[in-house]
Amino acid sequence: TGVYHLTLLHFLCDKFETFIFNPLVTNCNKNVDIRKVKNDKKDSIKIAKIGKFQDVKCSSSFDIEIYTLKSLCRDYYKITDSKSTFKKKLSTDLRVIFPGYITVFSNITCKTSMAILKEFSSPESILNADKDYLINLISSNSKKGLVHSEAIYKKLISASEDAVYICINSPSLFVKITNTLSIIENFEIQLANLLKEINFLMKSNRIPDNFKQNVALIYSIP
C-alpha cells in the first residue's frame, strides 16, 4: 500500500524488527493464481510466504524526517502541476474573452500581467483606463522603467482595440478570468510555504549529513 502501512510500521518499530516489502512485489506474487480472489486473509498468508520462502528485497529502515521531506516534495510538484493546468486554462479563456492579450506578455502569469488582469479584465476596461495610471501600474510591477512600461502600454492598447471587435463580449465570462487568477495566486502561496519548509528541514540537524551530501552531489551535476 502507499500510506496505510506507515502508522502500523511506526508503532511496531518501537518493539520489533520490522521489514517493508515493495507493494509491486507482493502484488505480482499474489496474482499468480488463475482466479483472482480478493481476500485479506488469503493475501496476508501469501505475503507471509513471500517473506519466508522467497529471496526478495526489503527495507528495514524508516526515517520520519526523510519521509516528511519526500512527502513535502511530492506535494510541491503536484501543486506545480495543478498550477500549470490553470495557467493553460487562463490562456484558453483569454483567447476567447481577450484575443491578442497573450501577445503582450511572454508570460501571462507574471506579476505585471496578473496585476492588469485583476484590475482590468476586459478590453473595454483597458481602453477606458487612465493612461498614466495604467503605465504606472505596469512600471510598479515590472520594475523596468518608463520606456519599457510605455512600450507594454502601446501593445496592450493595440491588442485591446482589436479584441473589442473579435472577442466574445459577455460580462459574465470575465468572472472566469478573476476566478482562475485567484486559484493561481493561491497555488503560489502554497508553493512558497512548502518550499520554505523544505529548505528549513534540509538546513536543520533533523536530516542526516550523508543525505544532505547526496543531495548536494545531485545538485552538482551540470
For the regions a language model picked out, list residue spans one by one.
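A detector of single, family-specific signature residues
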Residues: 1-222
